[in-house]
Amino acid sequence: MTSPSQVPLPPREPLSDDERIARARAFADELGNRRSVRDFSPRPVPREVIEACLRAAGTAPSGAHQQPWRFVAIADPEVKRRIRAAAEAEEREFYQHRAPAEWLAALAALGTDADKPFLEVAPWLIAVFYERFGVDAEGHKHKRYYPHESVGIATGLLIAALHRAGLATLTHTPSPMGFLNEVLGRPRNEMPYLLLVVGHPADDCRVPAIERLPLEAYASFLE
């Protein structure tokens, strides 16, 4: 077995424990203001912001370092219109026929329905895909390891980066999402993971009155 090629770890800024604690708390506090938004402003967002946030997403760890994420950033109004039409068709079917009563009850508190105007109003949509398998230049298939987990981590970094840039987001998951491959011309080895709506919140934006779990409800320490 050959030894992997290695390079020195890039240097990091030295910090005291107090500085680390302060940074960690400030970051947690900033993310504490993050909310999913459904009322967006059409105000433009420079492509450079989206590019930088996608670069951050691309730093995520991945199974066997295969980096199975694929992102399609969409600002074209006609493409957004087609996505909205297809998504709303699936959502109407979901709300009227496929969704179990328990799921609909859980969604009721969020005020969601089959109408998705934000898919056209928001300046950017980012379609997130994961590779089910890789395909080399000769057309041979190659297994992807932990693609769901890898793309989930990358998407979390993307959402955090967009929030840090002062933007609002919404994770949208119409079911099924196969129409995204057709509308966006993606190959069959890529599966839609979610659709991220990105932009500035509308001036009159309101969000559901919900509370997050306290730390002790979801984390434990063994010291």
List each model region and its residues.
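N-terminal accessory segments that position/regulate proteins before the catalytic core
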Residues: 1-37, 41-52, 93, 97
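C-terminal helix-cap and adjacent tail motif
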Residues: 2-23, 113, 191-223
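Short alpha-helical scaffolding segments that buttress acidic/His motifs in well-ordered protein cores
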Residues: 31, 53-57, 196
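Small-aliphatic-rich amphipathic alpha-helix that forms the alpha element of a beta-alpha
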Residues: 55-57, 126, 132-183
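Glycine-rich, charged/polar anion/phosphate-binding loops
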Residues: 56-58, 109-114, 180-182, 205
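Glycine-rich phosphate/pyrophosphate-binding beta-alpha loops
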Residues: 58-65
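Glycine/small-residue-rich phosphate/adenosyl-binding loop
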Residues: 67-151
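Short, electropositive alpha-helical surface patch
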Residues: 180-193
